[in-house]
């Protein structure tokens, strides 16, 4: 393969960081194409644990080029905090190993302020934002009032853009929400400092990535969040502000669709989501609590407890269709060891009709009753399994059901957080 995508097939938190790290071993380039520092990836290498938010997971290898694409919204403060964190763990970050799109939009202090103010104003209709300014930054991008990285590193352009934009933002903050105005000089001086630190990393990434593909290099596109958080195909409005599906790669990294050869959907062996919104297979009982504790289901970025439920094959089938997935990588199947019986959702009953897709309307999704098929569980710990044949027979049946229902093969199975707790069972 030459260019392939790794993306979340559920509501995020599926283990994309680990899978990207695993697959990056054979890649030359790793590209983040959307989202911002609202994403959280945990990668375990040996005895070390790394928590990443902005920087691609390929940074943990010494010989990979890592790319932050134009579809990402970049918080310079968060970026340099992450760089310092990684360097403290012995990871070298240089312009030879990390490049940033000159077209990426910059998260400004007023984005974070407005994110928090608007969320509080929603009251009990809050959408569960991380408060990091992601949504407001994408809003400015679409309103054509955003500041891009190429603007930030040109002093005169940045000065003019900041003056115009801050005047409007301060009116919104003070006159509509009753907040305190932000100081122009304080922001200007802070971000000029970031501009100089960013400058060596800034490139036209579309030119570089396409040349790598043309030269036959292996390019891995790393998604953040998940399919059901996509701005168009997710459970709107409880979604993120970017395109998390395969189509987002073309926009967020400047490559054409014909360049993509494979798309791998990462899916937990059960389902989780953070925040509000319908969740047909949610477990609101002791089983849900058990899965949450055993699976350590707490957000990397927010620390929030994740809602847990049975595996929903309707969601996986929807993800496979929308992104043209060529295979699934199933993670955390080890978490399910010890349950006598497992349930898998194979359809929804909505207004007397059985459907096998996720409806657009939240009201309809909230009415959906899951139709379950039961499977016998397995008692054995499978954390030491290193090939398909090491898995219990019931675990293999469980994986086969995923393949049969979604008409998409399972190519990778993960049985723990470490690199070596991963088995490739077929080509992706």
UniProtKB/Swiss-Prot annotation:
Domain of life according to the entry: Bacteria
Catalytic positions? 13 (proton acceptor), 41 (proton donor)
**Which Pfam families is this protein grouped with?**
Adenylsucc_synt (PF00709)
Q: How is the cofactor bound?
A: Binds 1 Mg(2+) ion per subunit.
Where, in this chain's numbering, is GTP bound? 12-18, 40-42, 306, 332-334, 414-416
Q: What's an example of a GO molecular-function annotation for this chain?
A: GTP binding
What catalytic activity does the UniProt entry give for this protein?
IMP + L-aspartate + GTP = N(6)-(1,2-dicarboxyethyl)-AMP + GDP + phosphate + 2 H(+)
Q: Which SMART domains match?
A: Adenylsucc_synt
List ligand-binding residues for IMP: 13-16, 38-41, 130, 144, 225, 240, 304
Q: Which UniProt keywords apply?
A: Cytoplasm, GTP-binding, Ligase, Magnesium, Metal-binding, Nucleotide-binding, Purine biosynthesis
Q: Which CDD domains match?
A: AdSS
Q: What SUPFAM superfamilies does UniProt report for this protein, alphabetically? A: P-loop containing nucleoside triphosphate hydrolases (SSF52540)
Keyword Ligase (UniProt):
yes
Q: Which processes are annotated in GO (biological process)?
A: 'de novo' AMP biosynthetic process; IMP metabolic process
Q: Give the EC class as a word.
A: ligase
Pathway the protein acts in? Purine metabolism; AMP biosynthesis via de novo pathway; AMP from IMP: step 1/2
Spell out the subcellular localization from the entry: Cytoplasm
Say what the protein does: Plays an important role in the de novo pathway of purine nucleotide biosynthesis. Catalyzes the first committed step in the biosynthesis of AMP from IMP.
Q: Which HAMAP family match?
A: Adenylosucc_synth (MF_00011)
Family classification: Belongs to the adenylosuccinate synthetase family.
Q: Which NCBIfam families match?
A: PRK01117.1, purA
Protein's recorded name:
Adenylosuccinate synthetase
Question: From which organism does this entry originate?
Answer: Clostridium botulinum (strain Hall / ATCC 3502 / NCTC 13319 / Type A)
List the top taxonomic levels of the source: Bacteria, Bacillati, Bacillota, Clostridia, Eubacteriales
Q: Gene for this protein?
A: purA
């Amino acid at each position: 393969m030459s260019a392939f995508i790794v993306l979340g097939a559920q509501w995020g938190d599926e283990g994309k960081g680990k899978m990207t790290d695993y697959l990056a071993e054979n890649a030359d380039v790793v590209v983040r194409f959307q989202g911002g520092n609202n994403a959280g990836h945990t990668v375990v290498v040996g005895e070390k644990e790394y928590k990443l938010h902005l920087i691609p997971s390929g940074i943990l290898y010494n010989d990979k080029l890592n790319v932050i694409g134009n579809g990402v919204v970049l918080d310079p403060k968060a970026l340099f905090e992450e760089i310092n964190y990684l360097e403290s763990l012995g990871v070298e970050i240089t312009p030879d190993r990390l490049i940033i799109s000159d077209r990426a939009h910059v998260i400004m202090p007023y984005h974070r302020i407005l994110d928090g103010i608007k969320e509080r104003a929603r009251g009990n209709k809050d959408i569960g934002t991380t408060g990091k300014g992601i949504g407001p930054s994408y809003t400015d991008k679409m309103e054509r009032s955003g500041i891009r990285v190429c603007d930030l590193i040109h002093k005169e352009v940045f000065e003019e853009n900041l003056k115009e934009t801050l005047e409007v933002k301060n009116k919104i903050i003070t006159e509509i929400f009753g907040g305190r105005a932000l100081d122009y000089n304080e922001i200007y001086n802070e971000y000029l400092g970031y501009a100089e630190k960013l400058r060596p990393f800034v490139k036209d990434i579309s030119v570089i990535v396409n040349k790598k593909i043309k030269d036959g290099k292996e390019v891995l596109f790393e998604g953040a969040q998940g399919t059901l958080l996509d701005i168009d195909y997710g459970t709107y409005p409880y979604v993120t502000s970017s395109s998390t599906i395969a189509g987002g790669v073309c926009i967020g990294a400047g490559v054409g669709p014909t360049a993509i050869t494979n798309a791998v959907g990462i899916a937990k062996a059960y389902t989780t989501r953070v925040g509000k919104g319908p969740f047909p297979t949610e477990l609101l009982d002791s089983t849900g609590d058990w899965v949450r504790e055993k699976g350590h289901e707490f957000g990397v970025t927010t620390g929030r407890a994740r809602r847990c439920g049975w595996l929903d094959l309707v969601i996986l089938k929807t993800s496979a269709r929308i992104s043209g997935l060529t295979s699934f990588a199933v993670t955390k199947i080890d978490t399910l060891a010890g349950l006598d019986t497992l349930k898998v959702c194979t359809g929804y009953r909505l207004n007397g009709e059985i459907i096998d897709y996720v409806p657009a309307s939240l009201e309809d999704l909230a009415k959906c009753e899951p139709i379950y098929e039961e499977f016998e569980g397995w008692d054995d710990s499978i954390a030491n399994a290193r090939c398909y044949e090491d898995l219990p027979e019931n675990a293999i049946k469980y994986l086969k059901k995923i393949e049969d229902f979604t008409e998409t093969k399972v190519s990778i199975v993960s049985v723990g957080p470490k690199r070596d707790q991963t088995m490739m069972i077929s080509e992706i």
